[in-house]
């Protein structure tokens, strides 16, 4: 989907989320606590959110929220993000794309 690709490529960190999802809240909080200013798309609030969710599923995202893209690349969901954080790979990745300055 062209719209999805445009959304992903416009910012260094993009999170697809739903307000009703506790794991989405956790992932958003993690990035914000790092000092990152992610672009967040709440799929339960935006136009064509269901369509975007289906496009994420076609990319292999399961569950479809939260889904994180860093530097235009699919990182994955909460499990993948937390694994990167715990093995200390997340911060260097954020620095490489200019999302984190420290």
From Swiss-Prot:
[2Fe-2S] cluster binds at residue 21. One of its GO terms (biological process) is response to nitrate. Pfam families: Glutaredoxin. Its main location: cytoplasm. It is found in: Cytoplasm; Nucleus. GO terms for cellular component: cytoplasm; nucleus. A motif (Responsive for interaction with TGA factors) lies at residues 99-102. One of its GO terms (molecular function) is 2 iron, 2 sulfur cluster binding. Keywords: 2Fe-2S, Cytoplasm, Iron, Iron-sulfur, Metal-binding, Nucleus, Redox-active center. Residues 1-101 form the Glutaredoxin domain. May only reduce GSH-thiol disulfides, but not protein disulfides. Belongs to the glutaredoxin family. CC-type subfamily. PANTHER family: GLUTAREDOXIN (PTHR10168). This is Monothiol glutaredoxin-S4. It comes from Arabidopsis thaliana (Mouse-ear cress).
């Amino acid at each position: 989907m062209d719209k999805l690709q445009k959304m992903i490529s416009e910012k260094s960190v993009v999170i697809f989320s739903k307000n009703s999802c506790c794991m989405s809240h956790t992932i958003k909080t993690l990035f914000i606590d790092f000092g990152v200013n992610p672009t967040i798309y709440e799929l339960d609030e935006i136009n064509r959110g269901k369509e975007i969710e289906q496009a994420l599923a076609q990319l292999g995202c399961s569950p479809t929220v939260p889904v994180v893209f860093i530097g235009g690349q699919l990182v994955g969901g909460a499990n993948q993000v937390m694994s990167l954080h715990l093995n200390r790979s997340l911060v260097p990745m954020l620095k490489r794309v200019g999302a984190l300055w420290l």
